[in-house]
Amino acid sequence: MSTVCHNCRHPEFLGVECAWPAPGCSATAAPRRRPVVSWLVRTVAAASLLVALLQFGQAGYIQAKAWLAQALIAQAWQKTLAGQTQVKPWPWADTWPVARLRVPSRGVELYVLAGSEGRSLAFGPGHVFGTAQPGAAGNSVIGGHRDTHFAFLQWVQAGETVEVEMPTGAVAVYRISDQRVVDKSDTGVMASPPDSHRLTLVTCYPFDALRAGGPLRYVVTAEEAGTPL
């Protein structure tokens, strides 16, 4: 409810002194703090927007770097197919392509790098040292980032095929048999059963996590589907 100040004829709320006293008004003006509150709101909003833009810019830079690197790695892979070995995609690189990975049903084509260290994974999926070479007998384990090259793993289904092109040009065909979430300490992911021809793709989980890393991994297992092409 509101009344009208009898002295200055400005509206006032019951129990609140007149905020716009006219000359001669007996009411005492109440301090106006609305501008301070508005300034705080604007400042917080601007800061939030700045943080969001910085995060978006960083994410865009990571995405651009990841896919630009794949274009350079593709050139190195062509030289590898021509008979060269350990062809670095750029002079200062400490890795090189060891396979080409394709998932026809998803339109995915990626070049796999030697090693699964963080520096390598920034540019492409990486083959884990100590496991079978991609396309060879045993269990070949390949890791990749959930928000760039291996983001597609969240959509693949059992029965889809994965093709691995080797440096010789031969292609091994695998069929996805299993998807599961494990703890990152689960070494069974790299186990190689006798007479196995397995491809294991690993990335961080969950896919929508705000921070990289974490204790969980998403594992896609594929078994050889037939004779290499």
Residue ranges: model-predicted function:
Residues 2, 15, 198:
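Residues immediately within or flanking Cys/His clusters that coordinate Zn2+
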Residues 5-25:
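Cysteine-cluster motifs in flexible loop/terminal segments that predominantly coordinate metals
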Residues 39-229:
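Solvent-exposed, non-transmembrane regions of membrane-associated and secreted proteins
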